[in-house]
Swiss-Prot record:
This is Regulator of telomere elongation helicase 1. It is found in: Nucleus. It comes from Homo sapiens (Human). InterPro entries: ATP-dep_Helicase_C, DinG/Rad3-like, Helic_SF1/SF2_ATP-bd_DinG/Rad3, Helicase-like_DEXD_c2, HHD_RTEL1, P-loop_NTPase, RAD3-like_helicase_DEAD, Rad3/Chl1-like. Changing F964L: In DKCB5; severe form consistent with Hoyeraal-Hreidarsson syndrome. A motif (Nuclear localization signal) lies at residues 151-167, 871-877. Residues 1176-1185 have a biased composition (Polar residues). [4Fe-4S] cluster binds at C145, C163, C172, C207. Residues 757-766, 1200-1219 have a biased composition (Low complexity). Residues 7-296 form the Helicase ATP-binding domain. Belongs to the helicase family. RAD3/XPD subfamily.
Length: 1219
């Protein structure tokens, strides 16, 4: 690795750093060496995380080397090198004036980010460096605990108290192993993230939570989320000593909000009422136990849990405190307009004093609350919700966080802290009240509307000052979007002598930024409150987005100021048919409000962008939402970003109003040069920082490029542009004519695509960083799990290790068809029918501890894990099947799933949601009229979707088949092939047939065609240990001479190699290198797991976009194993709407042969040798390979059709995506 010397420190960097990276590392060293704070902004994609890690760890090593050199020189006492000065030994600490005399004085590095998933990314970067420090990651019990009983607790605070109870009683064997095993090399040495820590703890049966706390003592660098540092209670809980440490806040644009929220609270009537209910329960139990003269079983000495060490009088006093607090809050008079009242921060002490909560009593109250919560931890029941009591305990700690000696309301420190707070009391909008309590202790406020007590901190500097008071050596805040840096430093209220606004590492031809003040019709674009919902503005914005989507290739991101604005805009565009036109250009994916469905939505977007022949996709998101931060939209996933307005906070929100008033007051008190922003400046910056976060999605690395559209006339003002990041400002251009925007953007992308290298194909998609995303979305290969995508040999077949005896042909692709004819273990039973498949897919959940990639939207109903296959290669037996209807049901299930795949590919996200809801309603109500009314608008308007409507016929309930036929003819002009017997339920059709005597006719055991029957010699071959195929060739003209079901599998011989090579050559020409790679990966996966669903999903996405690719789908049958042939042919027919060539299903000429029971007993008979059997079998297979069905000719064949490469996915005349 290159070694760079900066400020006298040698830094090992994984590659030669760019100039901006060297400047960044120099500023970091300046903070560390001079013991000062720094604010460092460096755009996303410039490698700031790597620079931070390498620089800080190199500086620590430099200090350690200096101490070592000084100690050696002192011991030598100048005898060895009398002429050399002491400073020449690298006494860096002495030279810098640092009083670091021993190794334990070397500062620890505390690296904080917003979420653990972001920290995992940082740890992965650390593994890529040459540094191997002692590492520790701090997490909560919710993330780290492996005790089954503790993990069952629903809330975090219950886990905490139950854990403490078990630790105190030494009843947790995981905790008991911590001291013994914490020094083991496997646990102490490697760089472990949260997942690794849990896996190692489970393996060694040691508690990961307490193990991480042990490792913290000796760690060189400690990783933790923000709140562990900013929240005083969390600092105490994790015993974090900040004295002399270097604290780094990565993604620091969130620090301001986190500082304020960690020191604020909202106490609702529901919190107090639930707390009182819990205390009532404990008081009642203790009273009954006292009246009976013996302890309650829950509190007895024999109970494994320690009893409640509280007197009845103390519990009653605690209840009285809560009632008085509730009464004091309800006694505050509010104005009639429900606007609430605001008091100064010191009012909180007056209010709490009425309930006898003071600095003097807080200790006893907190102990009592803690005892009750810990006593009830682990107990089940509706009356043991201790969340209210826990919240009250946290609130008391926030209010009385300052020591009594310096925190009294009259002291200077207390006054300074209270200036940052406001008390706001307002009506409870949620009306979350418990039932009225009827005892004498019950509050009278329950009959009135409750009030919420809010205690809000408006200065992030309050938390920053607390960190400085703890003795932090240096505080470094860094992010990609801190602009304007000067105002950010003012908000923190502590000095930052070192500041940096780094440029980007990209060139000017890689970024295009334009302000679009007017739409194509000349109407002004504005998201101002009075214009955002006007018809003129919404219509013009919709037309502008549609035109931009035509010229931006691949992925396009559109950010709205808020969810209501996005939803209202979509509603307007759907009503005016603008949304349908956008869908025709690029399908729309909308960011959901809920956390659970976000991963699926973003995975669907990634998959659509990566699909071969796709024109891309559009993702509609919200500023400050999940997609605006932490997601990687690099390369084709995000070639353009559109910001539709300035996302100002809600202007009339009480918290926003009070924040602006507070800032104006502070600025006024400090005079014209006061170190505070004005309220209006802060308000504007909230919008600009959200915009900057959205802009940061487009350029993610050195070779990336993209365009930014600022679609609001207010961006044309100089003050708005001044708030943009420094690396963006030089590229901004304001356009007066919308046509010039389209012209310049089209030219930009033409030049970029010619000059920039094509992005490398990825095995996995960008990771979803952040806690909102439970699992990581993968693309462009959404059809495989993360575990398989990481295996190199899946994507490079030539690297796969061959077992001895496997073919080692020169062409690695020729080995793909080997062993396809072997039978796997049958799959477990699956749900039957379309509705059952839909319901089954919604109920499925991933297995814990296994990496899973969420399927894209087109595959959410597809893949299901099969049982592991048993060893193959054993002798195969003829099995007598007594229930021939089961394979039919399995095929029907496969058709249902694949039909859902096709529908989800063709419909938009909103329309697919409507479709699935209609299915659920039809399943529950059996209302065919409602179903038909829903399906008509979805499938009838577009002729390309008529085949989907007709394909739905097979899943309509029998008594509705005829009606559906009539609806189909009415909507599409074509029927579905209805016959009267289709109206008879399957069960009735499958009833046993009675012979003339009234007895049940014998059930046929085996079905074979006439041609197949001619190949069998029952007297010589069947069950006699001899060849199953007759040595005589099939007669000319016999149907058996053509490939039948299960006969098209090529072997690894020359003919098989040529067939495979020809097929893959045609696939590469038609689908491109990326599509062919996907096909190869799917084929390899099919060979390993025998999951036809997965390979069909990939195949459908690749070969059904264009009719000329249909032959590739049909010719794929050469790789399909025999037991999948019938399902594959039916699927081909369903997907293409054409009969499967050369694979006609069994017709009337088939005759059923009942195998006599005597044939199930084997008798050893002399037979031909193994070589003879092999030769005869191979000759038969070769005859099948020689005679190909029409339409499946290999490379160069006429039936395959010419291979055509897809055109560019953009341009003014871009074609509609899909079929």
């Amino acid at each position: 690795m290159p070694k760079i010397v900066l400020n006298g420190v040698t830094v090992d960097f994984p590659f030669q750093p760019y100039k901006c990276q060297q400047e960044y590392m120099t500023k970091v060293l300046e903070c560390l060496q001079q013991k000062v704070n720094g604010i460092l902004e460096s755009p996303t994609g410039t490698g700031k995380t790597l620079c931070l890690l390498c620089t800080t760890l190199a500086w620590r090593e430099h200090l350690r080397d200096g101490i070592s050199a000084r100690k050696i020189a002192e011991r030598a006492q100048g005898e060895l090198f009398p002429d050399r000065a002491l400073s020449s030994w690298g006494n860096a600490a002495a030279a810098a004036g640092d009083p670091i005399a021993c190794y334990t004085d070397i500062p620890k590095i505390i690296y904080a980010s917003r979420t653990h998933s972001q920290l995992t990314q940082v740890i992965n970067e650390l593994r890529n460096t040459s540094y191997r420090p002692k590492v520790c990651v701090l997490g909560s019990r919710e993330q780290l605990c492996i005790h089954p009983e503790v993990k069952k607790q629903e809330s975090n605070h219950l886990q905490i108290h139950l854990c403490r109870k078990k630790v105190a009683s030494r009843s947790c064997h995981f905790y008991n192993n911590v001291e013994e095993k914490s020094l083991e090399q496997e646990l102490a040495s490697p760089i472990l993230d949260i997942e690794d820590l849990v896996k190692s703890g489970s393996k060694h049966r040691v508690c990961p939570y307490y193990l991480s706390r042990n490792l913290k003592q000796q760690a060189d660098i400690i990783f933790m989320p923000y709140n562990y540092l900013l929240d005083a209670k969390s600092r105490r809980a994790h015993n974090i000593d900040l004295k002399g440490t270097v604290v780094i806040f990565d993604e620091a644009h969130n620090v301001e909000k986190m500082c304020e929220e960690s020191a604020s609270f909202d106490l609702t009537p529901h919190d107090l009422a639930s707390g009182l209910d819990v205390i009532d329960q404990v008081l009642e139990e203790q009273t009954k136990a006292a009246q009976q003269g013996e302890p309650h079983p829950e509190f007895s000495a024999d109970s494994p849990s320690p009893g409640l060490n509280m007197e009845l009088e103390d519990i009653a006093k605690l209840k009285m405190i809560l009632l008085r607090l509730e009464g004091a809050i309800d006694a505050v008079e509010l104005p009639g307009d429900d606007s609430g009242v605001t008091k100064p921060g010191s009012y909180i002490f007056e209010l709490f004093a009425e309930a006898q909560i003071t600095f003097q009593t807080k200790g006893c109250i907190l102990d009592s609350l803690d005892q009750i919560i810990q006593h009830l931890a682990g107990r089940a029941g509706v009356f043991t919700n201790t969340a209210g009591l826990q919240k009250l305990a946290d609130i008391i700690q926030i209010v009385f966080s300052v020591d009594p000696s310096e925190g009294s309301p009259g002291s200077p420190a207390g006054l300074g802290a209270l200036q940052s707070y406001k008390v706001h009391i307002h009506p409870d909008a949620g009306h979350r009240r418990t039932a009225q309590r009827s005892d004498a202790w019950s509050t009278t406020a329950a009959r009135k509307r409750g009030k919420v007590l809010s205690y809000w901190c408006f200065s992030p500097g309050h938390s920053m000052h607390e960190l400085v008071r703890q003795g932090v050596r240096s505080l470094i805040l860094t992010s990609g979007t801190l602009a304007p840096v000067s105002s950010f430093a003012l908000e923190m209220q502590i000095p930052f002598p070192v500041c940096l606004e780094n440029p980007h590492i990209i060139d000017k031809h890689q970024i295009w930024v334009g302000v679009v003040p007017r739409g194509p019709d000349g109407a002004q674009l504005s998201s101002a409150f009075d214009r955002r919902f006007s018809e003129e503005c919404l219509s013009s914005l919709g037309k502008a987005l549609g035109n931009i989507a035509r010229v931006v290739p691949y992925g396009l991101l559109i950010f709205f100021p808020s969810y209501p604005v996005m939803e209202k805009s979509l509603e307007f565009w759907r009503a005016r048919d603008l949304a349908r036109k956008m869908e025709a250009l690029k399908p729309l994916f909308v960011e959901p409000r809920s956390k659970g469905s976000f991963s699926e939505t973003i995975s669907a977007y990634y998959a659509r962008v990566a699909a071969p022949g796709s024109t891309g996709a559009t993702f509609l998101a919200v500023c400050r939402g999940k997609a605006s931060e932490g997601l990687d939209f690099s390369d084709t996933n995000g070639r353009g970003v559109i910001v539709t307005g300035l996302p100002y906070p809600p202007r009339m929100d009480p918290r926003v109003v009070l924040k602006m008033q507070f800032l104006d007051e502070m600025k006024g008190q400090g005079g014209a040069g006061g170190q505070f922003l004005s309220g209006q400046e802060w308000y504007r910056q909230q919008a600009s920082r959200a915009v900057n976060q959205a802009i940061g999605r487009v350029i993610r690395h050195r070779q990336d490029y993209g365009a930014v559209f600022l679609c609001d006339h207010r961006f044309a003002f100089a003050d708005a542009r001044a708030q943009l990041p420094s690396w963006v400002r030089p590229h901004v251009r304001v356009y007066d004519n919308f046509g010039h925007v389209i012209r310049d953007v089209a030219q930009f992308f033409r030049v970029a695509e010619r000059t920039m290298p094509a992005p490398a194909p990825r095995a996995t998609a960008p990771s979803v960083r952040g806690e909102d995303a439970v699992s990581e979305a993968k693309s462009p290969g959404p059809f495989f799990s993360t575990r398989k995508a990481k295996s190199l040999d899946l994507h490079v077949p030539s690297l796969k290790q061959r077992s001895s005896g496997s073919p080692a042909a020169g062409d690695p692709e020729s080995s793909l068809c080997v062993e396809y004819e072997q039978e796997p273990v049958p799959a477990r039973q699956r749900p039957r029918g379309l509705l059952a498949a839909l319901e089954h897919s919604e109920q499925r959940a991933g297995s814990p501890g296994e990496e899973q990639a969420h399927s894209c939207s087109t595959l959410s109903l597809l893949s299901e894990k099969r049982p592991a296959e048993e060893p193959r290669g054993g002798r195969k037996k003829i099995r007598l099947v007594s229930h021939p209807e089961e394979p039919v049901a399995g095929a029907q299930t496969d058709r249902a799933k694949l039909f859902m795949v096709a529908v989800k590919q063709e419909l938009s996200q909103a329309n697919f949601a409507t479709f699935t809801q209609a299915l659920q309603d039809y399943k529950g109500s059996d209302d065919f009229a409602a179903l038909a009314a829903c399906l008509g608008p979805l499938f009838a308007e577009d002729p390309k979707k008529h085949n989907l409507l007709q394909g739905f016929y097979q899943f309509v309930r029998p008594h509705h088949k005829q009606q559906f036929e009539e609806v189909c003819i009415q909507l599409t002009g074509r029927g579905c092939g209805y016959r009267p017997e289709h109206s008879i339920p399957r069960r009735q059709r499958a009833q046993p047939v009675l012979d003339p005597t009234g007895r049940t006719a014998p059930d046929p055991k085996l079905t074979v065609s006439t041609a197949a029957a001619q190949q069998l010699d029952p007297q010589e071959h069947l069950n006699q240990g001899r060849p199953h195929l007759s040595p005589r060739p099939p007669p000319t003209g016999d149907p058996g001479s053509q490939p039948q079901w299960g006969s098209g599998v090529p072997r690894a011989g020359k003919q098989g190699q040529h067939a495979v090579s020809a097929y893959l050559a045609d696939a590469r020409r038609a689908l491109g290198s990326a599509g062919c790679s996907q096909l190869l990966a799917a084929l390899t996966a099919y060979k390993q797991d025998d999951d036809l669903d997965k390979v069909l999903a990939v195949l459908a996405a690749l070969t059904t976009a264009k009719p000329e690719d249909f032959p590739l789908l049909h010719r794929f049958s050469m790789f399909v194993r025999p037991h999948h042939k019938q399902r594959f042919s039916q699927t081909c027919t369903d997907l293409t709407g054409r009969p499967y060539p050369g694979m006609e299903p069994p017709g009337p000429q088939e005759e059923r042969l009942a195998v006599p029971p005597v044939l199930t007993h084997r008798a050893p008979q002399p037979g031909p040798s193994r070589s003879e059997k092999t030769g005869k079998t191979q000759s038969k297979i070769s005859s099948f390979l020689r005679q190909r069905p029409a339409g499946t000719v290999g490379a160069g064949g006429e039936d395959a059709g010419p291979s055509q490469s897809s055109g560019p996915p953009h341009g003014p005349a871009a074609s509609e995506w899909g079929l």
